[in-house]
Regions:
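Bacterial N-terminal signal peptides that target proteins for export
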Residues: 2-15
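Glycine- and acidic-residue-biased ligand/ion/polar-headgroup-sensing regions
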Residues: 94-97, 101-106
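A short, N-terminal "cap"/entry segment at the start of jelly-roll beta-barrel domains
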Residues: 10, 26-74, 154-158
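Bacterial N-terminal signal peptides
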Residues: 13-24
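Short acidic-glycine-tyrosine-enriched beta hairpin
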Residues: 113-128
């Protein structure tokens, strides 16, 4: 029978072997999933575009298409400020889309049902649904909009 000192030594040796094996496995995993790092910073003041309400919604809006020029990005991340009286016209959704209200008030019609949206409201519109949005009151309705798109094929280099 081994005494307590030998049992402790064996446990430590086994723990060291397990730790080294796990480290080697993690290193191999890191090698497989290595991706180049980096980041992109954009400020809304640099990308603001005055536009009419999208989807023939009327009125004036300010659109901010963050990271629009970043290649191979499938996430669309936008901010839109709807000026008083403006809106986003009724349209059918081609992909899941999320709206999040930062400030102001709006009236959103979702598949024929109208609901009020206020700061802190998040709305998920699913593929095939229809919706429109109208700014309400004296304050701009400021929203964030997120959805994914498929990557566009790139032309082969000549």
């Amino acid at each position: 029978m081994l005494n307590a000192d030998w049992r402790t030594r064996i446990r430590c040796a086994l723990a060291a072997i397990a730790f080294m094996a796990a480290g080697a496995g993690m290193h191999a995993l890191a090698q497989q999933k290595a991706v180049p790092g980096g980041y992109v910073i954009e400020h809304d003041a640099d990308i603001a575009v005055n536009e009419p309400g999208t989807h023939n919604g009327g009125g004036q809006t300010v659109g901010y298409s963050f990271f629009k020029k970043v290649p191979n990005l499938t996430l669309v991340f936008r901010k839109r400020a709807l000026k008083p009286g403006s809106g986003i016209g009724l349209h059918e959704q081609k992909e899941d889309e999320i709206y999040y209200v930062l400030s102001g008030k709006g009236s959103m019609t979702l598949d024929g049902k109208t609901v009020e949206i206020t700061p802190g409201t998040a709305v998920l519109t699913r593929t095939g649904s229809s919706h429109s949005l109208k700014q309400v009151g004296d304050e701009d309705l400021v929203i964030m909009i997120n959805y994914e798109v498929e990557l566009k094929p790139t032309a082969p280099a000549k």
